[in-house]
Amino acid sequence: MKSHGIVHKYGDNVDTDVIIPARYLNSSDPKELAKKCMEDIDKEFVNRVNLGDIMVANKNFGCGSSREHAPIAIKASGISCVIAETFARIFYRNAINIGLPIIECKEAARDIDAGNEVEIDFDSGIITNLTKGTSYQGQAFPEFMQKIMKADGLINYINEQLEAV
Amino acid sequence: MGMTMTQKILAAHANLPEVKAGQLIEANLDLVLANDITGPVAIHEIQRLKKKTVFDKDKIALVPDHFTPNKDIKSAEHCKCVREFAKEHDITNYFEIGEMGIEHALLPEKGLIVAGETCIGADSHTCTYGALGAFSTGVGSTDMGAGMITGKAWFKVPAAIKFILTGEPKEWVSGKDVILHIIGMIGVDGALYKSMEFVGAGIKNLTMDDRFTIANMAIEAGAKNGIFPVDDLTISYMKEHGAKPYTIYEADEDAEYEQIITINLSELEPTVAFPHLPENTKTVKEAGEVRIDQVVIGSCTNGRIGDLRIAAKVLEGRKVAKGMRAIVFPATQAIYLQAIEEGLIQTFIKAGCVVSTPTCGPCLGGHMGILAAGERAASTTNRNFVGRMGHVESEVYLCSPAVAAASAVTGKISEPSELFS
């Protein structure tokens, strides 16, 4: 599985309130949430983003509220993967559970710039920066999380477990 | 190798003799929580599951508290979705507004969570119950929905930071100042993926309300959970609130901690977190002249009776500054009633505050006290991110109830002692 797109770059501590502000949480429709994604930190994001694009950020991405609407909004906006130096733990779980690919890679997070063209190979964890001609080794997921992702999220994984019983 | 308090609770709930940091386990859950924002997403996910019956109708809590009383049609529909789910599955602990409260104040008050138990909640401040010596942590809707059906959740066993608390806090210094000080010290990702375990002789000088406040904001340092040892005060609290059987776990002598931090409570000062991160802390003395437009006293962090008593003590016989909007939110109906009986509500109203029904409203910028561009609030809530309480160009300063009340009187971030000298 690969993803390939243009980078939207952010800094440290991007919290779930700016990813999807609470005033929009009276909807749980992914399409509606996607229209408001990143509004409080990057008003132009929704106009700029194309299907397959990649989000890159520094430390502690997705901190704060546990709202699953945050990874849902990012995924529904067309983003194919989020690369960050570190993720807040609830966001990390939520992303895996809803099938939004995420990769922790300090080197990539620091070196990749906004607008760079990037390709990610999820099987090897290798991130290639086509603009700069550099590549970085992202962290591989534990086997258990890979199983959840292969099943395309926690719900399908649990269904598989229920069938096996 | 010994285990931390958190690791012991997780091992017991995973039916394992021991667990180690980094190990992936599946743990049995004693309580699963959702609210009106996260519930509908989970209920939608549950429809996709092959098993649709809940694991235990007595071990699920559904608390519509965020956009309630319903702020608009969409919120009303979300609440209706949760209400109908509760009815369909005969959920014992569903709380309509007349019997409700903000979830993290309500659940301990109702005795639904006690020492030694495990809880996941689709709300990041679920870590509050660590004050009772329980393992509780925030998750997303899918994890929570899966938990409601299976009664289990997977966890990566956390490493831990030990905080040794010594001494006694000065007058006007409370749990909020302690946790703001800690977050200022270690940063908003200082405890990322880890447990914050609080120990030491200073704990006996912290009320249960102080401990709830501290555990509540563990997430603001990125922690998986915050946890306190169980002492006589915890036991009497649990007995007063439902007397469910509990189990006391203690960390082993040789438990491993990634970091040990000692904090002398007597050295702490009233503290405030500047925009736009809870880690941007200064003492109130260092804050300088920060004019404010609105004060919010309440929330799952600071809306308990002890918090209201402190705020009333400051506001007694005083008036809020001209042009100040001061809003008080008792965290539950029971706390509201107690505040009426103790005369606290009269004090607030005479001082020129408004008093609201329990709701999460302003804390997350939902309703009931939204800020316009350029406005500033001093708030006893838990987050001050960009746009958290309203407009992206508004600002939130996090503080204790004592500092919030004093600031309401002076119109700027102030220490209560300024009013009592």
UniProtKB/Swiss-Prot annotation, chain A:
Keywords: Amino-acid biosynthesis, Branched-chain amino acid biosynthesis, Leucine biosynthesis, Lyase
Gene Ontology terms: biological process: L-leucine biosynthetic process
Ranges in a coiled coil: none
Described purpose of this protein according to its UniProt entry: Catalyzes the isomerization between 2-isopropylmalate and 3-isopropylmalate, via the formation of 2-isopropylmaleate.
NCBIfam families for the chain: leud, LEUD_arch
Catalytic activity of the protein: (2R,3S)-3-isopropylmalate = (2S)-2-isopropylmalate
GO function terms (MF aspect): 3-isopropylmalate dehydratase activity
Protein name listed in UniProt: 3-isopropylmalate dehydratase small subunit
Highest taxon of the lineage: Bacteria
Cross-referenced InterPro entries: Aconitase/3IPM_dehydase_swvl, AconitaseA/IPMdHydase_ssu_swvl, IPMI_Swivel, LeuD, LeuD/DmdB_bac, LeuD_type2/HacB/DmdB
Main EC class the enzyme belongs to: lyase
Gene3D superfamilies (alphabetical): Aconitase, domain 4
Pathway the protein acts in: Amino-acid biosynthesis; L-leucine biosynthesis; L-leucine from 3-methyl-2-oxobutanoate: step 2/4
Subunit field text: Heterodimer of LeuC and LeuD.
Sequence similarity: Belongs to the LeuD family. LeuD type 2 subfamily.
Pfam family, any one: Aconitase_C
EC number of this enzyme: 4.2.1.33
Swiss-Prot record, chain B:
Catalytic activity: (2R,3S)-3-isopropylmalate = (2S)-2-isopropylmalate
Enzyme class, spelled out: lyase
Domain of life where this protein originates: Bacteria
UniProt remark on cofactor binding: Binds 1 [4Fe-4S] cluster per subunit.
Binding site for [4Fe-4S] cluster: C300, C360, C363
GO BP of this protein: L-leucine biosynthetic process
Cofactor(s) in the UniProt record: [4Fe-4S] cluster
GO molecular function term, any single one: metal ion binding
Pathway: Amino-acid biosynthesis; L-leucine biosynthesis; L-leucine from 3-methyl-2-oxobutanoate: step 2/4
Keywords: 4Fe-4S, Amino-acid biosynthesis, Branched-chain amino acid biosynthesis, Iron, Iron-sulfur, Leucine biosynthesis, Lyase, Metal-binding
Cited function: Catalyzes the isomerization between 2-isopropylmalate and 3-isopropylmalate, via the formation of 2-isopropylmaleate.
Subunit structure, interactors included: Heterodimer of LeuC and LeuD.
Family to which this protein belongs: Belongs to the aconitase/IPM isomerase family. LeuC type 2 subfamily.
Record PANTHER family: 3-ISOPROPYLMALATE DEHYDRATASE LARGE SUBUNIT 2, HOMOACONITASE, MITOCHONDRIAL-RELATED
Protein name: 3-isopropylmalate dehydratase large subunit
Organism lineage: Bacteria, Bacillati, Bacillota, Clostridia, Lachnospirales
